Amino acid sequence: MQPADPGEVTVLLQQIGHGDAHAVERLIPLVLHELRTLARLQLRNERPDHTLQPTALVNEAYIRLVTDQARNWQSRAHFIGVSASIMRRILVDHARRRQALKRGGLSRRSALDTENCAALSDQQAEELLTLNMALDRLEEMSHRQRRVVELRYFGGLSSEETAEVLNVSPITVKRDWLAAKTWLKGQMRHQPAG
């Protein structure tokens, strides 16, 4: 299946931003394949026998995307970037629920119910939470570098697409990507999840 025409997707996103509810119905078939690919990217480090499937992640992200009252997507790349951010937050919430179950407590339920918490091993949940804490610290130092990581690593966007979303040059994205990766590697080595 070919990816959707970026121009057509951008037009639909702009129509959605102007309140056209029918544009959402036309958009989803055009981006569903990309969202599933993005979900597979997000789940690539999970155990092979996990119960959390890309479809469940796409469905949860879709619910959050369409209920977001402040949606103002400028382009296909921006939409995919926002989708990646939402999917990452869903996985972090999922890891937190897994840790809460492990300790005997349970936070609120979502479409990714507690049965799916078994999809993450204890180590994977801990690593995801450690990465999330490191990204929070990176945010304090450089919002743009955190966004570059989110868009490149979690969103699978190229340097050029990331530059478009962030309104910077591709060389700036490449510099930020290198700096952020180096910094995060150091943080991941020295910080246990808390």
List each language-model region with its residue ranges:
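Sigma70-family region 2
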Residues: 14-18, 41-48, 60-78
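Σ70-family region 2.3-2.4 aromatic/basic alpha-helix that recognizes the −10 promoter
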Residues: 32, 55-63, 76-96
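Arg/Lys-rich amphipathic alpha helix in sigma70-family domain 2
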Residues: 41-44, 88-106
